Design a protein with these regions (language model features):
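Bacterial Sec-dependent N-terminal signal peptides
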Residues: 1-24
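Active-site-proximal flexible loops/turns
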Residues: 9, 95-96, 123
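Residue-level signal for secondary-structure boundary elements
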Residues: 9, 37-40, 116
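Catalytic-loop region of hydrolases
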Residues: 20-110
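Conserved alpha/beta-hydrolase
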Residues: 105-123
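Catalytic nucleophile-loop/oxyanion-hole region of alpha/beta-hydrolase
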Residues: 123-129
Length: 129
């Protein structure tokens, strides 16, 4: 779990410290290690919004246990804005809605990183054990 947290922290810090022209976020995300898919989403509040899939080991102590894909939603308003991270305790499907905006993100005009919890919805390892 700590390894996953460290990876996610590094991932999000990398996203926010890279200075790039608008529209380059998708390329920057795709260049990060472990990213297995990016899909652009529609949003009423974020100029750029993506579903990012991160491939991780099921058990960091046992690489033979395989991997799973964790779903993360990234809403981007600017490199000069703060970032809110939501570590949802369940599924993240509601964050896919174009009208969704986290309350703090709205108040601070902040970027959003919304992490779906492992073993929920699309972030479920196969087989579950």
């Amino acid at each position: 779990m700590r390894r996953t947290f460290n990876f996610l922290l590094l991932f999000f810090l990398s996203v926010m410290t890279v200075m790039a022209a608008p529209g380059d976020l998708q390329e920057k995300l795709a260049a990060l290690k472990g990213i297995s898919g990016i899909e652009k989403l529609q949003s009423d509040h974020y100029p750029e919004k993506y579903v990012v899939r991160i491939t991780q080991q099921v058990d960091p102590k046992d690489p033979a246990a395989g991997t799973f894909t964790q779903r993360v939603i990234v809403g981007h308003v600017g490199y000069d804005r703060p970032t809110i991270i939501v570590t949802e305790g369940y599924g993240a499907a509601y964050a896919l809605n174009p009208k969704y905006q986290e309350e703090l993100s709205k108040l601070l005009n902040a970027n959003l990183v919304f992490v779906e919890y492992r073993y929920f919805l699309e972030s479920t390892p196969e087989p579950k054990n």
